[in-house]
């Protein structure tokens, strides 16, 4: 597989959001309150944060085929400094071709370079193929995740 993984730079916010929207393909779904313009604005805010990295995987034709985001999170008393992979999305035509592994490797390297002791990743319960991929990549099934919506999206 001939892909290159590089960090997104300012000005590429809309392209990153396009990659995120691949998460809406089955078995995923579009969130009911999804607003693409708001997502582009949030991506610009995220790109300005030094504790966050957004990555693009590109084919040899420079086509966007995958995206990932990772951020430094809490310093846990029990486990040390955590990095969280917020998003990892691969274009449907490029799945099972090494793109996700390339993005994951790059995100893990970034986390290690930035002092993280471990990486946390949540994945929707319906994404069983993604779960198998994460386990093949050496992850352990460590927790169940729960969510409360406490306000309106900004």
Named regions from a protein language model:
Residues 95, 120-130, 147-149:
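Conserved beta-strand-loop-alpha-helix junction that forms the acyl-donor binding cleft
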Residues 125, 134-144:
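Conserved acetyl-CoA-binding loop of GNAT-fold acetyltransferases
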Residues 111-123:
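Conserved GNAT acetyl-CoA-binding A-motif
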Residues 44-56, 84, 140:
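A short helix-loop-beta-strand connector motif used in the catalytic cores of GNAT acetyltransferases and
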Residues 90, 96-109, 136:
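Conserved acetyl-CoA-binding loop-helix of GNAT-fold acetyltransferases
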Residues 18-33, 76:
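Helix-loop element at the rim of GNAT/NAT acetyltransferase active sites that forms part
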